[in-house]
Amino acid sequence: MIAATVYCIVGCNTGSPDKDALKVLECDTETGAAKVVQSVNGCEGTTYFQIDRERKFLYSAVSEGKKGAIVRFALDGHRIGEMTKLAELPCETPCHISLTPDEKRVAFAVYWSGVAGTVGIDGSDLKTFTLPNDDMGDNKKRQQKAFAHQTFFLDPKGVGRGEMGVVDLGCDRVWFFDPYTMERRKDLCIKAAKGDGPRHALFLPRSDNKVLYLVNELGSSVSQYAFDGATFTLMGKTSMLPGGFNRWAEDGENLVTKAAAIKTTADGKIVMASNRGYDSIAFYEVGTLGKLKLRNIAKLRGKFPRDFELMPGERFMVVGHKMSNEIQVYAFDREKCTLEPAGDPIPCWRPLCFKFL
């Protein structure tokens, strides 16, 4: 039974004029209506956050001048409470964080420094690793060095330590580590195509972690990999853009669009990925062995859809339009894989991350 009223936490980028770092949306799953019911400040931006399984705490990356930090907010139902600083980082603010499967450590990826690491949920035992600047991608403007963009786990729903993947946009790689020691596994690595610039990885929910999707920011595509527990094998790569669309500017050096987030429906039968520039959501049907078939590319009202999330019940989608500083709710037609605006946009400074409670 899906509740008629649900709550969604929104992370806002640094530099917000109203100083808000987090907002809470109250959403109606039957009509799509949404409104802000809480705004939280006291820190500079929340680039990305994660919520623990018991929904007691929200862990976030925040900015402290030129350095980053990991903080924790207490949750009381849908209310965000007091913030506790857990750890200062020796580098800038992470662009992504996650929790280890046993929820004893916070993992993070720092884009510009090319650093990945973990820290205990009590702020102790900080471990970091600087990704190697080897074998850069072909895009000379975006792949000058290693760029850590995401951390994820081979067994995301497990209770053990798991093994951590780090998506490297600069080197077209996914590296793997022990999250407790940050020792790199030299026998396991995904090598994406040159110039693809991978951004985020996602396991197909119903695949027992045997199918992995990799959204390529620079290539505007989704790669599909089979995983047998020891090796990732490329099954295919599917474009996120319509045929004939030129993703390069007239100078041939600058991209006019780039991919961002990747999600699936709850049953894992539809995969969705967002285009920033060619502002849209690409929808794919999941076929045999997890291979993807493009169903539709739904154009959006706002600019630069950085992140998005389906409401519980999956009749509506909440999209964060970073460059038009707004949140827009869209009605989602699952059969046609289409989106239609539902209501007026909600003003919000550069929304970056959405999580429903």
Question: What annotation goes with each model-predicted range?
Answer:
Residues 255-321:
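Loop/turn-rich, solvent-exposed surfaces of beta-rich toroidal or solenoidal domains
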